C-alpha cells in the first residue's frame, strides 16, 4: 500500500507494466526513472522515448479496449479525468491510482509516490532536491524586485480564459510572489 495526500492505494509491489493516462503524470514517472507502457495522445512535443509509447486517446477520452489489451499491472491517471474508468478497471482486477492533483503543491508528494511505486526512492529524492533548489534560485533572483502584477491567459480554439491561483501556471506565479490581477479582481 502507498499513500498520496491522505489517500491509500493498494498497488503491486514491483509493477512492470504501468499504464499512464495523463502525460503530466507520465513526465513525473519518467523523471524518477520509471517506465510506462502507454501515454495519452497529444499535439505537444514529447521526448522520443515517450513518443514511442502506444497512445490511448486523448486524456479525457481513453480507449479502454486498447488499455485493457496492454495488460497493465497498475494504471495511473487523474481523478478528475479518469474516475469514469475506475469500475471497469476494478472488474478487470487492475489496480488504479487516480491522483487528485491540486496544482504544483502536489508535485513533491507525487514524485515521492512515484519513486516508492517504482522502487526508485533515491532518484525521486534527487529530483525533488533539484526541483526545490531551482525554485529557491528563482525566488532568490527576484526577491529584490517589485512584485509584478500579471494575468495568466489561456487561449484555445474555443476562446480565452483567465487563470485563477488554482490553475498550474497561475499557482507558479503566486509561488514567486507575483500578484494575479484576476484573483485580486475576484476578491475585490
Where do the model's predicted regions map?
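Extracytoplasmic ligand-binding site segments that recognize negatively charged/polar headgroups
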Residues: 100-113, 147-172
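Solvent-exposed loop/turn segments at secondary-structure junctions
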Residues: 24-27, 42-45, 81-83, 102-106, ...
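Charged, glycine-enriched surface loops/patches
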Residues: 86-121
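Bacterial Sec-exported substrate-binding components of ABC uptake systems
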Residues: 1-24, 122-153
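Short, structured coil segments at secondary-structure junctions
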Residues: 32-33, 92-93, 176
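Stable alpha-helical elements in mature extracytoplasmic
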Residues: 25-28, 63, 81-85, 107-110, ...
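Alpha-helical, coiled-coil/dimerization segments enriched in small aliphatic residues
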Residues: 42-46, 161-188
